[in-house]
Amino acid sequence: MPEKSLYEMAVEQFNRAASLMDLESDLAEVLRRPKRVLIVEFPVRMDDGHVEVFTGYRVQHNVARGPAKGGIRYHPDVTLDEVKALAFWMTWKTAVMNLPFGGGKGGVRVDPKKLSRNELERLSRRFFSEIQVIIGPYNDIPAPDVNTNADVMAWYMDTYSMNVGHTVLGIVTGKPVELGGSKGREEATGRGVKVCAGLAMDVLGIDPKKATVAVQGFGNVGQFAALLISQELGSKVVAVSDSRGGIYNPEGFDVEELIRYKKEHGTVVTYPKGERITNEELLELDVDILVPAALEGAIHAGNAERIKAKAVVEGANGPTTPEADEILSRRGILVVPDILANAGGVTVSYFEWVQDLQSFFWDLDQVRNALEKMMKGAFNDVMKVKEKYNVDMRTAAYILAIDRVAYATKKRGIYP
């Protein structure tokens, strides 16, 4: 578990970078705080006829550089603190990538596994109607997150469109391709992780074809990261895990086969061609690249001394606590931070939004080439700041992002 609340952890990362910059204290205070927090309590009629009331959130952290952008998650443990932290991170993630967005995030406190498909649709449509007062294709553009997918985005898009009386494709991203979605969106976060893993190997002088990689978390991000790292970089993926545990094989896995197995059996732990390990053991394996792509706070003060990887490429949001960051930095382990490493998803969401506004759609190669170019550009921008300030990559990414948002805030001024 994280030693601090997620929001405290996010603010601490911000403060660490802000203290190294010539940032006025009042401007820092503006950048720390969320612009708008909406809490909604809304009724949903269940299949048996009774009505349940659910709690939902939408937080817009900052809109100095453009509309708020960020996902909506469905989870029984969703809290306002968590949603505020994730919106905060989205502000810096979009700025690191130099996208014309600010940060937003949303969530509903619900266990979607306990809902029928009809109940899930009714909940989704009612929640989106409730937050419609603050969203729009030029205000705030939601996207999928934990337990939400292209189907949910289609319901959101239809709900908003019905309410305004015409089809508005650009209200959400992560939609089905047939409904204004972008090709390459599903693989985008994993592809971004792959690009960053390859660039981290370049920095450390590791030959990708001889590199070993462990991936914690085998959902969308972990699966695509593992697949693309093995297929396009030629590295050996020697360990993967999901919520039930992990498997290890020093000879490497056939990741395509592993993904098929996970789809059929719901887990990787029973896969016969690997030795069973725990999630904790996976993190401490002697590999070149570790990709934490599961939950927040996986690498913490309690295990950071035992991490043996040469680089950590963060597929998840907030997988490394500030205390662990200090330990890894002291030990010379390169950490490619979440606000850079997993920004592939929001970058292709940007491409989708642009395509929707223009009603002009790109082919898959255009999407992939544009994403790889932007990820490499952002990685190099962060490395320049890292060298200039002699700091770790996370602090450098924050300095770069804060500088961009602070500049926009100062140039816009305070209205009235």
UniProtKB/Swiss-Prot annotation:
<dbReference type="GO" id="GO:0004352">
    <property type="term" value="F:glutamate dehydrogenase (NAD+) activity"/>
</dbReference>
<dbReference type="InterPro" id="IPR006095">
    <property type="entry name" value="Glu/Leu/Phe/Val/Trp_DH"/>
</dbReference>
<dbReference type="Pfam" id="PF02812">
    <property type="entry name" value="ELFV_dehydrog_N"/>
</dbReference>
<keyword id="KW-0560">Oxidoreductase</keyword>
<dbReference type="InterPro" id="IPR053388">
    <property type="entry name" value="GLPV_dehydrogenases"/>
</dbReference>
<dbReference type="InterPro" id="IPR036291">
    <property type="entry name" value="NAD(P)-bd_dom_sf"/>
</dbReference>
<protein>
    <recommendedName>
        <fullName>Glutamate dehydrogenase</fullName>
        <ecNumber>1.4.1.3</ecNumber>
    </recommendedName>
</protein>
<dbReference type="InterPro" id="IPR006097">
    <property type="entry name" value="Glu/Leu/Phe/Val/Trp_DH_dimer"/>
</dbReference>
<keyword id="KW-0521">NADP</keyword>
<dbReference type="InterPro" id="IPR006096">
    <property type="entry name" value="Glu/Leu/Phe/Val/Trp_DH_C"/>
</dbReference>
<dbReference type="InterPro" id="IPR033524">
    <property type="entry name" value="Glu/Leu/Phe/Val_DH_AS"/>
</dbReference>
<dbReference type="InterPro" id="IPR046346">
    <property type="entry name" value="Aminoacid_DH-like_N_sf"/>
</dbReference>
<keyword id="KW-0520">NAD</keyword>
<comment type="subunit">
    <text>Homohexamer.</text>
</comment>
<feature type="active site">
    <location>
        <position position="105"/>
    </location>
</feature>
<dbReference type="GO" id="GO:0004354">
    <property type="term" value="F:glutamate dehydrogenase (NADP+) activity"/>
</dbReference>
<dbReference type="InterPro" id="IPR014362">
    <property type="entry name" value="Glu_DH"/>
</dbReference>
<dbReference type="GO" id="GO:0006538">
    <property type="term" value="P:glutamate catabolic process"/>
</dbReference>
<comment type="similarity">
    <text>Belongs to the Glu/Leu/Phe/Val dehydrogenases family.</text>
</comment>
<dbReference type="Pfam" id="PF00208">
    <property type="entry name" value="ELFV_dehydrog"/>
</dbReference>
<dbReference type="InterPro" id="IPR033922">
    <property type="entry name" value="NAD_bind_Glu_DH"/>
</dbReference>
